[in-house]
């Protein structure tokens, strides 16, 4: 894999079957792997595997479902899935790059606004996102 999560990564979104795209501050980067694979690889790149990161999350906040993952501590790279991480259509969002979020006119969508002014609709209700 040739991509690691970094402080400019806003989200990792699925595209075609088995592929995704990293949404960054200054553009989008196509990736030939799933969004979960990007998260797993990035955890390992920064020294601790994904399952260990999930276990740490559970230990501290008792979250098992759609739990945030600290990809890297010192840079505060924290990502969370908007649905089950095993779902191939899951979007992973950067916790620290989100400025605000609001209800969409569509019932099962939320508009997420990032620190750089970029916004995107994600396929999850406002109540679930909140």
Show the residue positions of the predicted features.
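Eukaryotic intrinsically disordered, low-complexity regulatory linkers and tails enriched in Ser/Thr/Pro
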Residues: 1-93, 97-130
């Amino acid at each position: 894999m040739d991509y690691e999560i970094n402080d400019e990564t806003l989200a990792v979104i699925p595209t075609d079957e088995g592929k995704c795209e990293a949404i960054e501050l200054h553009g989008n980067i196509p990736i030939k792997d799933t969004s979960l694979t990007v998260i797993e690889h990035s955890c390992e790149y920064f020294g601790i595997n994904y399952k260990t990161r999930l276990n740490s999350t559970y230990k501290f906040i008792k979250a098992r479902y759609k739990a945030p993952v600290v990809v890297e501590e010192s840079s505060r790279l924290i990502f969370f899935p908007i649905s089950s991480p095993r779902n191939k259509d899951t979007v992973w969002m950067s916790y620290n790059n989100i400025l605000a979020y609001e209800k969409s006119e569509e019932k099962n969508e939320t508009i997420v606004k990032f620190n750089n002014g970029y916004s995107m609709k994600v396929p999850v209700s406002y109540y679930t996102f909140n």
